[in-house]
Amino acid sequence: MKKASLVGAFFVSIFCSLQALAFCPSPGTLPLVGVAKVVDGDTLRLVDGRSVRLIGINTPELGRDGRKAEPFAVAAQRRLRALVEASNGRVGLVPGRESKDRYGRTLAHAYDEQGRNLESALLAEGLGLMVAIAPNTALVACHRRAEQQARQSRLGVWRKLTPRSTRAVRQGGFALLQGMVERVEHNRGGYWLEMEGPLVVHIPPQAFSAFDLAQLPRLAGKTLEPRGWLVDRRGRAGTGQARWMLRVTHPAMLGLPR
């Protein structure tokens, strides 16, 4: 029975991945570039020396500096490597509107030889979480569908992953959270959604165009499922302010109630 269950899960994973490959089709014929190395589940090193951080996905971290790999980190790396190999070691790239990150890596969407999006394939198998960081949000809708498919089927990280309570925030890094909005503040620095526990979600002014601003004050009392990178403000937050901050630049990262 257990073997049958595993076999069934395997075919569900393959079926979901095949569906997801059609979620974000290539915008046209792309020049293909060689991949020298799959660094991890969301980073490639090209033969021309560039490092490429895939847009729209955050995969589990590999072990380094004495830390163990996060669950499914190795699986994500292996799956991305397999997708690249199936594309004869070459990918097409569509750079984001913001083309570099703070580490100097190229920010881009990657496609195989058939024009199928690699991020959506990984998301549909539950090998990463969707992220939406303005201005690189062109494929948010199809990436969300791919993730939702994996979540509903409990694939990959979604077998055990559940949102952590905002009351339980204790360390930085990427997190999927859940909690109630206690209060919404607005000032020159943006909108501040004060959550249960030691967390505030910050929407900066430059991101306002992506949000329905009239709806933000009405989120007080609602439960959200925000995700993103937690910043420790200890020593910088004022008296009575939350220690932890999560900066959001697109509504998809808020986990708004449906």
Enumerate the predicted regions with their spans.
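Positively charged N-terminal leader segments that act as targeting/secretion signals
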Residues: 1-10
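Small beta-barrel nucleic-acid-binding modules, primarily SNase/OB-fold domains
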Residues: 18-258
